Amino acid sequence: MLLQESAGVWLALALVTALTPSPSMAVPWQDCTGAECPLLENCIEEALEPGACCATCVQQGCACEGYQYYDCVQGGFVDGRVPAGQSYFVDFGSTECSCPPGGGKISCQFMLCPELPPNCIEAVVVADSCPQCGQVGCVHSGRKYAAGHTVHLSSCRACHCPDAGGELICYQLPGCHGNFSDAEEGDSERQYEDPYSYDQEVAEAEATTAIVNEVQAGAEGPPAALGGGNLPPSSIRVTPWPVALPRPTAAAALGPPAPVQAKARRVTLDTEEDEEEEEEETLVTEPPTAGSPGRLDSLPTRSPARPGFPVQEKEAEAKAGPEENLIPDAQVTPRSVMQEGAAPLPRSGLAALSPSLATDSSSEDPVKPSDHPTLSTLPPDRAQVSPSPETPEEIPQHPQLLPRFRAEEDIDPNSVHSVPRGDLDGSTKDLIETCCAAGQQWAIDNDECQEIPENGAQSDICRIAQRQCCISYLKEKSCVAGVMGAKEGETCGAEDNDTCGVSLYKQCCDCCGLGLRVRAEGQSCESNPNLGYPCNHVMLSCCEGEEPLIVPEVRRPPEPEAAPRRVSEMEMASREALSLGTEAELPNSLPGDDQDECLMLPGELCQHLCINTVGSYRCACFPGFELQGDGRTCRPDRGAPQLDTARESAPRSESAQVSPNTIPLPVPQPNTCKDNGPCRQVCRVVGDTAMCSCFPGYAIMADGVSCEDQDECLMGTHDCSWKQFCVNTLGSFYCVNHTVLCAEGYILNAHRKCVDINECVTDLHTCTRAEHCVNTPGSFQCYKALTCEPGYVLTDGECTDVDECVTGTHNCQAGFSCQNTKGSFYCQARQRCMDGFLQDPEGNCVDINECTSLLEPCRSGFSCINTVGSYTCQRNPLVCGRGYHANEEGSECVDVNECETGVHRCGEGQLCYNLPGSYRCDCKPGFQRDAFGRTCIDVNECWVSPGRLCQHTCENTPGSYRCSCAAGFLLAADGKHCEDVNECETRRCSQECANIYGSYQCYCRQGYQLAEDGHTCTDIDECAQGAGILCTFRCVNVPGSYQCACPEQGYTMMANGRSCKDLDECALGTHNCSEAETCHNIQGSFRCLRFDCPPNYVRVSETKCERTTCQDITECQTSPARITHYQLNFQTGLLVPAHIFRIGPAPAFAGDTISLTITKGNEEGYFVTRRLNAYTGVVSLQRSVLEPRDFALDVEMKLWRQGSVTTFLAKMYIFFTTFAP
């Protein structure tokens, strides 16, 4: 019974292996093993549908690579991916980068600014962006009208601007019977303006005669548009010389004046061909505003009087278009109004102004000039003018219309003033140009743009142009100053007076410093568009060594007139001898192309003043004189007030003291300044003596009458800096920046030529006292002092013969001639003179001038020409004007081709074009005249149109420009755009290359990494980076990858290529165990075990033996009822303590108790038994096994159940190996 119960007890064994847990297996939706998914090209968003093995593309597009990523983020694509068909802008909106349809690579295209629509009247310009149209409307006669508005151009005329802009729609108001003529039409006879015509002429406000218009009897006062009341003739005063002007002690600036004097309107008196009587002129007066005396809003207008022209039509024209006469902010000199009974003004091209100050009988100080002249504004009486050829023409007693002026300015009576043309009938371009020049001049004079005076008559265009050009000039000026400061090593600090933030001094100084540093390091000068304008351009200019230049205003050629002006025969006759070609013959001439005849032939063309005009010149007279019929000479003005009478009634003042450069005439005469006396320029009466003086820039000559130019450059009275050289002109000078560097031993003269320095004269040599200095070109030489014999002199280190006959050191008597010899001379008797010669007192034969000694050597029509010993009679040649010469037959005058004969004065780099009687100098394409209009300078197109000519970098070249691209780009065929270079085609990368916009990126295949040079790929040692992670046994690195290896015996590589699988030699039959042995597989090997049952036991299974019989109870209790064999495999280094075997009865009953004992194999104490509870025990490892080792343990378990004891034996074979998969 006990045996049966014991036989029914089963042992439950458990192996504790915490190191190898069993993972839970997840069941997929679908088995996708071996499925191949297609490559999704240009896909930026994927999606995997339920049940599918491959993802599908939801959105195609372009991936932003490199620096493009930041542009994409700025453009709104935060993930760095641009959907197909969408784009973004970079470089301040000048370049559009887009992703093509279907995705791929991003391409960028430079965009030029679109043209504004023609009906745009207001452009909105955003910083670093293209201009956009802010408002549409209509432009009529230079004025802008908003769309949808209706305006009244006259009392009987209204015009409407359509909603879409375009042309004004005008109509006559019903019930109105006024003149319907277009009062807004421009003056068809408006003269051409030359912005660079720096001529010797007086200011327009002082050089033009007051123009008078006939007023018919019965007229009811002046037109309403002109203002003012009625003024009796007795209230009209005459001021012979303008009150606000200084005494005329200065001549006109004959040289190139300042840019403010670059524009002067010329007023010419045009006559109809069929009218022989002279024009009548009108003076219109508008009262000055309170608080600003002397400032009016109009200039005199001209209206020729024709028969049958009614007064009502003239008044209607004046009422309909008062704007025609307005010139905003005209900086001119006010004219005075004539007194009753005063002599009429002359009919010359210049005002008959007297160099005397105005007097007023009602003033306490009759000689003190008024700082702010006042005008009478009562309406004039009606008067009729009847010109007569025998008597001077009477001028109606009308008040003049005085233009605006600035009384505090010091105005030269003969200087060229800038009169901006505010004629609203002109084109918008002309208005912008003239107002822009006024804004630049305000910046030059005041160095600020906040206090520009505003005039109600000015249009918005003029105000905007003035302010923008003023600010632009100050910015360019401060930028140039910053560049110069950087080059001179100054600290780049902000300007203290920059309260408006328009100064670019610090920015340009800093940016120039960057360019200078790059240049000092010897690096190449490359543009960096990211610096922006103007920093990038200034940096590049300083790096390349270019000088900054404020580019003069670029002017377009004038459009030809609709029809040539008709000139009367009388006027043509007075001009024929002076003109070098009419303006009608120069339709293609540019401003500044005119040859200044007054400067070419000073003092030869006119008696007093020479005024240059486009293609010709004209003569004018000093105050108190009028031009005669020949157009050259001047005669005293019979109608002008006498100077002596005006001065006799006025006490002396300090201003009438004699200037230091005046010389009194030796013989004083009463009334000596009548008709300007003997003086060439200015005559003054001091006591009873006529004193002649000169204008500034001139000095009185020894004769006390004439004036000669003072060379300020030689006298050292100029104010040119050390960076400039002085160029003298008639009466003035100007400074020019140095652009020519002379070699050592040479110096730059006033003509900008390098001339030799005479070191011997300037004491710059190093010769000793015993040596003689001899100057050589660019240097000098020192020679030892020599002693020459009599008759010789030391010259250039050598003794040369002295010509006593030439030096006059001979002693030959009368009748003898001196003959020079080497070192001496001799006297030779003279011979008798032949016919035609006469012996002088010294015995020489001199020629007899028969042309002067004979009474009539030649008959009429021939000229006497003296010859040596005789004379000849020659027919008088044909007298031709300048620019013409007689032909070979002497029958007619033909044009001189100055361009072919080389007598022109065109500068280097200019083109000469022959004209009838003259020639013209033009600049080559890409060049323009400088601010003085004398030389051609290169146009820096890159500064004129920054950021619009080239996509990347604009480089200025002489006469043109060229575009260049940044690294990674090539210039396109159009020479402006830049195309990306595909660097991958040149195989710059060792493995994979990806081209990106403006650059490229090298990539490496899997298993390689990019080296520091960015081009080479090096192998990645995966085994060193992932030690112990990649492979379970050993990792072997190979090029581009790695391989896992297993021990040479006992293992094989698994399908994953990383893990090693133990070879079961027992299952494979590769063991060498005998038939009596049992093969047991262990990690990497096997063991041959022999399971034999002892006597009295029978084998019930391969590993179990049971006892058969038992002789007595004691034997049954001591001998095991069953012997079981167990094989256990463990890895060395197992953490201790570790339960390796659990034993107990199965099934267990209440009251069961067990005990465990290791009876064999634990001599070293590696193992220990322990009871977990009454019926369960474990075998534990208490010492760590560090080396491979085999143990054979006998573990005996005794079971107490219901008072009996049963023994069980467990034979355990424990194997510790070094590696386990």
UniProtKB/Swiss-Prot annotation:
<keyword id="KW-0106">Calcium</keyword>
<feature type="disulfide bond">
    <location>
        <begin position="673"/>
        <end position="683"/>
    </location>
</feature>
<feature type="disulfide bond">
    <location>
        <begin position="720"/>
        <end position="735"/>
    </location>
</feature>
<feature type="domain" description="EGF-like 5; calcium-binding">
    <location>
        <begin position="801"/>
        <end position="846"/>
    </location>
</feature>
<dbReference type="InterPro" id="IPR055088">
    <property type="entry name" value="Fibulin_C"/>
</dbReference>
<feature type="compositionally biased region" description="Polar residues">
    <location>
        <begin position="652"/>
        <end position="661"/>
    </location>
</feature>
<keyword id="KW-1015">Disulfide bond</keyword>
<feature type="domain" description="Anaphylatoxin-like 3">
    <location>
        <begin position="511"/>
        <end position="543"/>
    </location>
</feature>
<feature type="domain" description="EGF-like 2">
    <location>
        <begin position="669"/>
        <end position="708"/>
    </location>
</feature>
<feature type="signal peptide">
    <location>
        <begin position="1"/>
        <end position="26"/>
    </location>
</feature>
<dbReference type="GO" id="GO:0005576">
    <property type="term" value="C:extracellular region"/>
</dbReference>
<feature type="disulfide bond">
    <location>
        <begin position="1023"/>
        <end position="1035"/>
    </location>
</feature>
<feature type="disulfide bond">
    <location>
        <begin position="950"/>
        <end position="963"/>
    </location>
</feature>
<dbReference type="InterPro" id="IPR056612">
    <property type="entry name" value="FIBL-2_dom"/>
</dbReference>
<feature type="disulfide bond">
    <location>
        <begin position="942"/>
        <end position="954"/>
    </location>
</feature>
<feature type="region of interest" description="Disordered">
    <location>
        <begin position="248"/>
        <end position="329"/>
    </location>
</feature>
<dbReference type="InterPro" id="IPR050751">
    <property type="entry name" value="ECM_structural_protein"/>
</dbReference>
<dbReference type="InterPro" id="IPR009030">
    <property type="entry name" value="Growth_fac_rcpt_cys_sf"/>
</dbReference>
<feature type="domain" description="EGF-like 6; calcium-binding">
    <location>
        <begin position="847"/>
        <end position="894"/>
    </location>
</feature>
<feature type="region of interest" description="Disordered">
    <location>
        <begin position="341"/>
        <end position="399"/>
    </location>
</feature>
<keyword id="KW-0677">Repeat</keyword>
<dbReference type="Pfam" id="PF07645">
    <property type="entry name" value="EGF_CA"/>
</dbReference>
<dbReference type="InterPro" id="IPR026823">
    <property type="entry name" value="cEGF"/>
</dbReference>
<dbReference type="InterPro" id="IPR001881">
    <property type="entry name" value="EGF-like_Ca-bd_dom"/>
</dbReference>
<dbReference type="InterPro" id="IPR000742">
    <property type="entry name" value="EGF-like_dom"/>
</dbReference>
<keyword id="KW-0325">Glycoprotein</keyword>
<feature type="glycosylation site" description="N-linked (GlcNAc...) asparagine">
    <location>
        <position position="1072"/>
    </location>
</feature>
<feature type="disulfide bond">
    <location>
        <begin position="1066"/>
        <end position="1079"/>
    </location>
</feature>
<feature type="disulfide bond">
    <location>
        <begin position="1093"/>
        <end position="1105"/>
    </location>
</feature>
<protein>
    <recommendedName>
        <fullName>Fibulin-2</fullName>
    </recommendedName>
</protein>
<feature type="disulfide bond">
    <location>
        <begin position="525"/>
        <end position="543"/>
    </location>
</feature>
<feature type="disulfide bond">
    <location>
        <begin position="598"/>
        <end position="610"/>
    </location>
</feature>
<comment type="similarity">
    <text>Belongs to the fibulin family.</text>
</comment>
<comment type="function">
    <text>Its binding to fibronectin and some other ligands is calcium dependent. May act as an adapter that mediates the interaction between FBN1 and ELN.</text>
</comment>
<feature type="region of interest" description="Subdomain NA (Cys-rich)">
    <location>
        <begin position="27"/>
        <end position="176"/>
    </location>
</feature>
<feature type="glycosylation site" description="N-linked (GlcNAc...) asparagine">
    <location>
        <position position="737"/>
    </location>
</feature>
<feature type="region of interest" description="Disordered">
    <location>
        <begin position="633"/>
        <end position="661"/>
    </location>
</feature>
<feature type="disulfide bond">
    <location>
        <begin position="511"/>
        <end position="535"/>
    </location>
</feature>
<comment type="subunit">
    <text>Homotrimer; disulfide-linked. Interacts with LAMA2. Interacts with FBN1 (via N-terminal domain). Forms a ternary complex with ELN and FBN1.</text>
</comment>
<feature type="domain" description="EGF-like 10; calcium-binding">
    <location>
        <begin position="1019"/>
        <end position="1061"/>
    </location>
</feature>
<feature type="disulfide bond">
    <location>
        <begin position="713"/>
        <end position="726"/>
    </location>
</feature>
<feature type="disulfide bond">
    <location>
        <begin position="492"/>
        <end position="509"/>
    </location>
</feature>
